[in-house]
């Protein structure tokens, strides 16, 4: 009996047929395991245990028994054959992965047709494609897209995604989309081709602020074709064409919506002068009332200016001897007007805070301001505002380049009243044009000259830059009107061009100091050491 129990206790399952804790199943008995044999187990520790037999109750013997946990009751092969098979547990279905977003590859025709592609940051975001033929396609982005995923909140990510939807918007004009610069260049090339501009000017034209010469050539050709024999008053033809080129450049930039930060294309401003409101009262560019100051002019008797003064101003001109004992023509003006900051300065000299405005005859200057006001009222009778404004240039050819440095002398074009000789003899009853009657009733014109003009038979004061810029106030307004006519003949829509209003600034002050100017040098070191 004891030996049988020992056999049962020492019986261990064969290798590959299950572990000691788990009895082999029918699958293990019927077919050998296809898996490789497990690694060899380490040697089992044995312990001594006393076993008592039934026959000899007093006697005891020691037997070596392997140290194993208590085995389950063994089952024979017959019992295994009769025992029912255990049902296998079905493996739980693996969670299906979310389908990957569909990748739709654009066709080669669609890729070639797309000229501009951008993302509209709406909610949900959309992909906007602009085709070369003016076609505009708006496609809602899939929520799996990185752009759409970055804009979604945590609550929105839990919601199911919606299907893509495409909306096709056709350009009603069917015009290809171009940039602002290309739009301006296309209009400029059309004008230069039509009016036969020089090829060099046409090739170098890039719609830059300092490229007025090419547009002035367009205006010059248009004047020769449409307005041959144009009458100008105290205006040079070159200055008139230059101002037309500036106004045309302003219309081109307004048409193309191109702007430059520190450059105004017209170079002009609207000054509310208020010099024709009160009789005998003039105001300078500061907006202050100008003061009376005696002004004495001496000219050589044999000079052209001296002879002209004796003929035209015989009541004021007289021949006297100067301090060197020479005979000169002297004209004394007691009605001269100057800026309030020049009260302590001698004639033709200005302080550092002066605006540089000076009139030798205040009455003639006021007549000129009344003339331009009446001219504006005759030209635009229904205008509610603007009759009291003066269109004045702020740059002559000396300071027309962008980014120029201040130079010695006056920083704004000189404003001088010119009298219309023999205009008093005209019969106003025979003239029906109100714009012409403005000059008959007020026989003087405001003329804009170079900032620091150099007159004939005289030397330049200070050696500053000078040019032959000269245009009257009515002709400056006519230049703007003619540019509008030129534009209307070539384009259907006239863009809105705004001339800024003049405001006094310290940059317009008279400069008595000449600042050194540097010239660019390509060398890295100034000296050869």
Curated annotation (Swiss-Prot):
Residues reported in the UniProt entry to bind Zn(2+) 1: 284, 286, 339, 355
Organism for this UniProt entry: Human adenovirus C serotype 5
Sequence positions that bind Zn(2+) 2: 396, 398, 450, 467
Domain of life: Viruses
Protein name per UniProt: DNA-binding protein
The family this protein is said to belong to: Belongs to the adenoviridae E2A DNA-binding protein family.
Basic and acidic residues composition bias: residue spans: 1-17
GO biological process: DNA replication; DNA-templated transcription; positive regulation of DNA replication; viral DNA genome replication; viral DNA strand displacement replication
Residue ranges, compositional bias (Acidic residues): 155-165
GO molecular function: DNA binding; identical protein binding; single-stranded DNA binding; zinc ion binding
Location of this chain's protein in the cell: Host nucleus
Recorded name of the encoding gene: DBP
Chain spans, region C-terminal arm, DBP binding: 513-529
Coiled-coil segments on the chain, per record: none
Entry keywords, A to Z: DNA replication, DNA-binding, Early protein, Host nucleus, Host-virus interaction, Metal-binding, Phosphoprotein, Viral DNA replication, Zinc
Nuclease listed as a keyword: no
Modified residues (Phosphotyrosine): 195
Subunit-level organization: Homomultimerizes on viral ssDNA bound to pTP. Forms a initiation complex with viral polymerase, pTP and hosts NFIA and POU2F1/OCT1. Interacts with host SRCAP.
Chain residue ranges for the region called Disordered: 1-107, 125-166
Function: Plays a role in the elongation phase of viral strand displacement replication by unwinding the template in an ATP-independent fashion, employing its capacity to form multimers. Also enhances the rate of initiation. Released from template upon second strand synthesis. Assembles in complex with viral pTP, viral pol, host NFIA and host POU2F1/OCT1 on viral origin of replication. Covers the whole ssDNA genome during synthesis. The complementary strand synthesis induces its relese from DNA template. May inhibit cellular transcription mediated by the interaction between host SRCAP and CBP.
């Amino acid at each position: 009996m004891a030996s049988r129990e020992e056999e049962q206790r020492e019986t261990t399952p064969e290798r590959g047929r299950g572990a000691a804790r788990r009895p082999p199943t029918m699958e293990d008995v019927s077919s050998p395991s296809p898996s490789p044999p497990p690694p060899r187990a380490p040697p089992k520790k044995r312990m001594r245990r006393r076993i008592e037999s039934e026959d000899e109750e007093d006697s005891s013997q020691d037997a070596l028994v392997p140290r194993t946990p208590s085995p389950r009751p063994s089952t024979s092969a017959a019992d295994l054959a009769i025992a029912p098979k255990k049902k296998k547990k079905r493996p739980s279905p693996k969670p299906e992965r979310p389908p990957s977003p569909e990748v739709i590859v654009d066709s080669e025709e669609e890729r070639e047709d797309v000229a501009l592609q951008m993302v509209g940051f709406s909610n949900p975001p959309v992909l906007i494609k602009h085709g070369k033929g003016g076609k505009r396609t708006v496609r809602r982005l899939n929520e799996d897209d990185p752009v759409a995923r970055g804009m979604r909140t945590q609550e929105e990510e839990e919601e199911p995604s919606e299907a893509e939807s495409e909306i096709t918007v056709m350009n009603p004009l069917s015009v290809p989309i171009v940039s602002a610069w290309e739009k301006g260049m296309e209009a400029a090339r059309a004008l230069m081709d039509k009016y036969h501009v020089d090829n060099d000017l046409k090739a170098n034209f890039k719609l830059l602020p300092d490229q007025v010469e090419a547009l002035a050539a367009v205006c010059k050709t248009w004047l020769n074709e449409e307005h041959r024999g144009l009458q100008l008053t105290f205006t040079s033809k070159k200055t008139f064409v230059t101002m037309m080129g500036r106004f045309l450049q302003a219309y081109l930039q307004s048409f193309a919506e191109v702007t430059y930060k520190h450059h105004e294309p017209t170079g002009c401003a609207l000054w509310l002068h208020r010099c024709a409101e009160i009789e005998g009262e003039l105001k300078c560019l500061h907006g202050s009332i100008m003061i009376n100051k005696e002004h004495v002019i001496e000219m050589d008797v044999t000079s052209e200016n001296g002879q002209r003064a004796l003929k035209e101003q015989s009541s004021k001109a007289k021949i006297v001897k100067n301090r060197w004992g020479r005979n000169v023509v002297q004209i004394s003006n007691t009605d001269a007007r100057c800026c309030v900051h020049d009260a302590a300065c001698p004639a033709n000299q200005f302080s550092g805070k002066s605006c540089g405005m000076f009139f030798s005859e205040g009455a003639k200057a006021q007549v000129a301001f009344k003339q331009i006001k009446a001219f504006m009222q005759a030209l635009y009778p229904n205008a509610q505002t603007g009759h009291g404004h003066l269109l004045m240039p702020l740059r002559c050819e000396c300071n027309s380049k962008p980014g120029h440095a201040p130079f010695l002398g006056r920083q704004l074009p000189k404003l001088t009243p010119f009298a219309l000789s023999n205009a008093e003899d005209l019969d106003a009853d025979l003239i029906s044009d109100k714009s012409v009657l403005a000059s008959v009733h007020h026989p003087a014109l405001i003329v804009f000259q170079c900032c620091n003009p150099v007159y004939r038979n005289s030397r330049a004061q200070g050696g500053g830059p000078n040019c032959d810029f000269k245009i009257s106030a009515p002709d400056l307004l006519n230049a703007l009107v003619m540019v509008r006519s030129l534009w209307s003949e070539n384009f259907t829509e006239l863009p809105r061009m705004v001339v800024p209003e003049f405001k006094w600034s310290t940059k317009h002050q008279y400069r008595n100091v000449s600042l050194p100017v540097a010239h660019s040098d390509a060398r890295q070191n100034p000296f050869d050491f």
